[in-house]
A protein has these predicted regions:
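Short, solvent-exposed loop/turn elements at domain surfaces
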Residues: 70-74, 144, 323
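Beta-lactam-recognizing serine transpeptidase/beta-lactamase-like catalytic domain environment
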Residues: 112-124, 128, 137, 167, ...
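Small/polar-residue-rich segments within soluble enzyme cores
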Residues: 1-131
Length: 406
């Protein structure tokens, strides 16, 4: 038939290299072909190994999935024995540790006659299994983390905002790290998926569901998402303020109205709360916006201070760069004047391309152009917990403890 002819033509790379005509064949069909070789000359039915995921959806965004090797991957790994149709790690640990997990393919040498018919099997080299890769994930913690995420999303979707509309809550992410070495204890992104659907080739229906789902179950929000960290960033601003000389821990900043003005624009506490005289400890305890707005303003306007002091401290805690995790992640954005100019370039509707005091004020409370991933934020807080030691993250137990001091 045309379908079979097309498959043979697409995969044929040599006169004696087998062409895969079908997979996931029913067992009854497999047995029938084996029992009636005279009816199917040149056709062999064989059982192939297939990746199994006994934990199902658990830790799917860490584990990742395999899939049929792409043309680009085939070219890049030409010398490693890969063939069209082979499975290849596409995401997560499956991709990061492909070389360890794959093993080696088997080999069969055949003798053929002048007409290309097989006369005998000369030799057979059996395939070998790949290596085990031990992860740092605690399965129990991972399970609780994923269950809590799902419950949180469902609760949010059942909650109305100030306008009376239910929250959209398309997804969520959570990360648990060991602050002593940066290893990942749990990392979850919701919604998730079952990597088993990719093993042996994903069906069109399953692919349509996964790739077209508006809530993006394949997207790892924990590592690749970029979000404004909000008040969780205030500790970075506090460290910058003290380290760069913008404030002393015991200094009080007056807050008599719940707002400050920057270029005639009011910047206020949530619900315009008033906290009166506020030192650093109190500012962190009550999450005073006015206190941190003031620090952001000082960095931009006060003579003798490093105008990008907050940005520099943020980068020492890992914001704006990869965490080093093997499965890949987003660097995020620590904005400054150069970044804003790049955004404005070629965009006549962008507005003011200069870095203004208001930009720094927004940055000080984790807003504006600042974007971080949940993993970056967790790693920064692990750095706080370990006395300023910021490690590169890893999910593989054999990874080294790479760190720097913030």
């Amino acid at each position: 038939t045309d379908v079979l002819d097309n498959r043979v033509a697409a995969q044929r790379s040599g006169p004696f290299r087998p062409v895969e005509l079908a997979r996931d064949v029913p067992e009854a069909t497999l047995v029938y072909i084996k029992e009636h070789p005279d009816l199917f000359p040149g056709v062999e039915a064989e059982v192939r190994s297939e990746r199994s995921y006994p934990l199902g959806e658990l830790a799917a965004h860490i584990v990742g999935h395999v899939g049929e090797i792409t043309e680009e991957q085939l070219k890049a790994n030409k010398s490693k024995g890969y063939r069209p149709g082979d499975e290849f790690g596409q995401e997560g640990v499956e991709a990061a540790y492909e070389a360890d997990l794959r093993g080696t393919a088997g080999k069969r040498v055949l003798e053929v006659d002048a007409k290309g018919r097989v006369v005998r099997t000369v030799s057979v080299v059996p395939p070998t299994s790949g290596n085990d890769v031990q992860l740092t994930i605690d399965v129990d913690v991972q399970r609780v983390t994923e269950e809590s995420l799902a419950q949180g999303v469902f609760a949010a979707r059942a909650t109305k905002d100030r306008s009376g509309q239910f929250f959209r809550a398309p997804g969520a992410a959570a990360v648990v790290l060991d602050p002593d070495d940066g290893s990942v204890v749990a990392l979850a992104s919701y919604p998730t998926f079952d990597p088993a659907v990719f093993a042996g080739g994903i069906s069109e229906q399953a692919a349509d569901r996964l790739y077209n789902d508006a809530d993006r179950p394949l997207f790892n929000r924990a590592t690749d998402g970029g979000y404004a960290p909000g008040s969780t960033f205030k500790l970075i601003t506090a460290i910058a303020g003290v380290a760069k000389g913008a404030v002393r821990p015991t200094d009080s900043i007056a807050d008599g109205t719940g707002c400050i003005k920057v270029a005639k624009q009011p910047f206020c506490n949530a619900q315009k709360a008033i906290f009166y005289d506020t030192n650093l400890t109190k500012a962190l305890t009550v999450s005073s916006d006015v206190y941190f707005y003031t620090l952001g303003q000082r960095f931009d306007t006060q003579a003798g201070l490093d105008a990008y002091g907050i940005q520099k401290i943020a980068r020492t805690f890992g914001f704006g760069s990869s965490t080093g995790i093997e499965i890949g992640d987003s660097a995020g954005v620590v904005p400054d004047g150069d970044y804003k100019k790049k955004l404005a370039a070629g965009n006549p509707d962008f507005g003011d391309p200069g870095w203004r005091t208001g930009d720094n004020v927004n940055l000080a409370v984790g807003q504006g152009f600042l974007l971080v991933s949940p993993l970056q934020l967790a790693n920064a807080y692990a750095g706080f917990a370990s006395g300023g030691k910021v490690y590169e993250n890893h999910a593989g137990a054999q990874a080294g403890n790479r760190r720097h001091d913030a």
